[in-house]
Amino acid sequence: MQVILLDKIGNLGSLGDQVNVKSGYARNFLIPQGKVVMATKANVEMFETRRAELEAKVAEQRAASEARAEKLSALDAVVIASKAGDEGKLFGSIGTRDIADAITAAGEAVVKSEVRLPEGALRNIGEYEVSIQLNSDVFAKVNLTIVAAE
C-alpha cells in the first residue's frame, strides 16, 4: 500500500516520502495515529499544498522535544528505592513505568513509552544512565540511582 509520510518514522523515511508498507500496518497503526495518508492523487496534491505548513509543525515539535531534553538532562540523579537482598539484587525489577513515574515525580513529565531500556528491566542496586526518546531523533540521558529500601 502506497502512503505519504506526515512525520519522520524510523525505518520508513521522513516527512513527504512516498513509501510502500503492508496494508495492515497502515490501516491499523499508521493511519489512526495520523502519521500517514494514503497516496491517492487528491492526497498527493493536498500534501504538496500543505508541505510548508507540515514542515513547520515538525520543526516546532522537534524544538519542543529538544527543550524537554535540556530540562531532563539538567535533572539531578533520580532516586528509586526498592526492596533488595543482601547482595544488591532487587526483589522484582525496575521497569519503564517505575522510571517514568520517578522522573515525573522529580519534576519533568515523562510517559513510559518514552523510556528506553535496551538491556531490559533493571534488577540490581546501582547507578544507571537511562535514555529517554522524546522524538524520533531527540534523545535525553537521565542518571538513575536505585537504592535499597529500608
UniProtKB/Swiss-Prot annotation:
What is the recorded function of this protein according to its Swiss-Prot or TrEMBL entry?
Answer: Binds to the 23S rRNA.
Question: What does UniProt give as GO cellular component?
Answer: ribonucleoprotein complex; ribosome
The opening ranks of the lineage are: Bacteria, Pseudomonadati, Pseudomonadota, Gammaproteobacteria, Vibrionales
How is this protein named in the record? Answer: Large ribosomal subunit protein bL9
Please state which protein family the record places this protein in. Belongs to the bacterial ribosomal protein bL9 family.
The UniProt entry, under Gene3D superfamilies, shows: Ribosomal protein L9, C-terminal domain (3.10.430.100), Ribosomal protein L9, N-terminal domain (3.40.5.10)
Q: Does the keyword RNA-binding apply?
A: yes
- Keyword presence, RNA-binding: yes
Tell me the name of the encoding gene.
rplI
* GO BP terms in the entry: translation
